[in-house]
Structures are given as C-alpha cells and as structure tokens.
Amino acid sequence: MGFKTGIVGLPNVGKSTLFNALTRTAAAQAANFPFCTIEPNVGEVAVPDARLAKLARIAKSQSVIPARMTFVDIAGLVKGASKGEGLGNQFLANIRETDAIAHVLRCFEDGDVTHVEGRVDPVEDAATIETELMLADLESIEKRLQNIVRKVRGGDKEALLQERLLKVAQAALEAGHPARTVDISDEERKAWDMLQLLTSKPVLYVCNVAEDEAAKGNAHSDRVTKMADEQGAASVVISARIEEEISQLDPEEAQMFLDEMGLEEAGLDRLIRAGYQLLDLQTFFTAGPKEARAWTIAKGTLAPAAAGVIHGDFEKGFIRAETIAYDDYLAYGGEAGAKDAGKMRAEGKGYVVKDGDVLHFLHSG
C-alpha cells in the first residue's frame, strides 16, 4: 500500500535542497529494507518508529523492516500555473497523483537567494499556490459538469451524485475556500475522492528556516503555524540546509551534529511522521525470528483488510487475527509470555485494528 506526499513550492524556497536530503536518506536506507526504489523525482523513506526495534529485540528478529512513505518532487510552480504557465500542466498532473501535499515555504532571510516576488512572505506564498490549485479545480469542475449534463437529465444516479458533489465543491471554491473544507459524509467519501480535486488533498506546511533557527523557528514560521491551525492543516519547522548536511553523515556523526545544534531529532523524521499523521495512517506490527516488520494502514481498518496489506490471499481466506497490544508484548517479553498471561486475543472480521497491535493472521488456502 503506497502513500505519496507531493513536495511543492515556489522557486528558491529550498524545495530541491529538502528533497535531495530525503533521497540521500532513502539511498542510505536502501540496504535496510526491500523494495526501496529511487527514481530522480521519488524518494521512499522509512517512517521513524522506536517501537519496531524494541519488538525486534524481544522476538530476536534477523531483519527489521520499517513502514515506508513516498515523497514526490513536484515540478516548480509559478503564478499562472492553472493556465499552463511554466510547468503548470505537468505540476497539476503530478499533484493529482499524490495523496497529500507538503508545501515548502521560505521562512528565512537571505539577500543572496532571490525570491520570485522580491519579498519574504510565506503566508502570501502559500496563498499563491492555493489560488492556482483552486483555479485549476474550478476549471476542472466546469468541464465535468458539462460532460455529465445528458446523464443527469436521464436521471442517472451516479451522475446526480457527482453533480451534487461538484456543485458543493464549486460553491466552496467560489467563496474562496479549498475543497478540503467541505464536510463530506462517510457514504459520499468514495465518490468525493474519485473527483480528485487538487484542493481536497490534506496539506502539510513545511517552514524552511535558517540553520540557527531550526530549534525554535522564527516570526515567519510562527505566522505559518497560526495559518495552519486556522485551516486545520499541519505544519513543521525544518532547516533544509541542516537536513542536507545530516543526510551525508553516518548515524553517530549525525547525532553529534544534532546535539551541537540543540535539536532532539532530525527534521526529516518529524516531516515524515507529520506526513504519516496527515494521511490519517497508523501502524501494526508482525514480529518473529525471521523479521520484525511495520505495516501501514488507514485508521479504522478492519482486520481482514489489514491482513490483505501483507498478502491478498490473507484477506480472502481470513479466519481470525491473534492480537497482542504493543505494551503487553513488551511487558510480558513477547508472544509466549503475553499468551500465558492471557493477553493474546482472538479477533474476528469485525475487529478494528489499533495502532501498535502485534498481529498474527490465520487464514485458509
């Protein structure tokens, strides 16, 4: 199950520097877990999770395989992208294929790095990109409404639902609000997602600050945090230059560097976790002598669907899930101890998997 977060930003905001750090990190991790494919514009990185190493120690696992997040470097954006200016059409097509948007904003002062608008104003920069995405959505909605006129007149149920959702989105956009602000019911969610509106995607604002401001941010990043809170979006403060330096060091050197800078952890770790949370994801584990592994699922996933993440046949032939809560697995020294203490539960098809569950699936076939 792949989850893609697109990294976007205006020119000279540090987007490429940040992405280079991500891809170097991904390259360094490539030997540690399988299926890590790295293309020029894609970086697949491990999701930091201290729980996995603890499980592996208890289970005496030979290998440790973390959950993964994919970041996609989206072509640079300029004002007018919705009309095809610059690489506008490519930008919009690439963003449509992602699950969320990480919007890099310039929150640093540097006279040697020019800004396309000749000023440093991250909130205004965010508005520039948001406006382009909203204009593109409005154009897309108008075309789609025209294309379904005949089906709507014929009373086609699917077309009628699509028309209603498109008009709700259109009204929000015309009022100056992105599509993600529209309240959609669970029953309508699938049809809504199929519209693939650019502004319906969750947003993470990445405040790129100077190296000496990485620990606490600055006035610019404070404004972005306030804006994100008002929008119900997420934000993270990071120094792309620091991340690029860290990505070239071995783990021990990187930790020393972080200590010197007064940072508890790499900004990329916070960025990856924030992207994970933004997509409403959670982790379950499998642990044994061969491997300890973290698996990614959406919150609210039922046990059979979680089994299907491991292999499609597990979902089809699902019988039950032997479940141990993470804390119980640690407290009782692993599967055998937890089972003896009565902490292993047999859960059926209706079980909603919890974050941190250590699972073993029984299935037919």
List the model feature ranges, each with a label.
Residues M1-T114, E142-K143, I148:
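Conserved G1/Walker A P-loop phosphate-binding module
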Residues G6, F35, P40-G43, A50-L52, ...:
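Short capping/connector residues at structural and topological boundaries
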Residues A26-P34, N41-G43, R51-K54, K83, ...:
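Glycine-rich, flexible loop/turn motifs
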Residues L22, G84-L87, V116-R119, N218-D222, ...:
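Short, glycine/charged-enriched secondary-structure capping and boundary segments
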Residues T17, P34, T70, V120, ...:
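Generic signal for short, ordered secondary-structure residues
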Residues G43-P48, A75-E85, R96-K157, A172-S185, ...:
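Conserved Switch II/interswitch segment of TRAFAC-class P-loop GTPases
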Residues F35, D49-L52, Q62-F71, E85-D99, ...:
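Amphipathic alpha-helical transducer elements in NTP-driven molecular machines
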Residues G2-V8, V13, F19, N147-K354, ...:
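C-terminal-of-GTPase-core extension/linker across diverse P-loop GTPases
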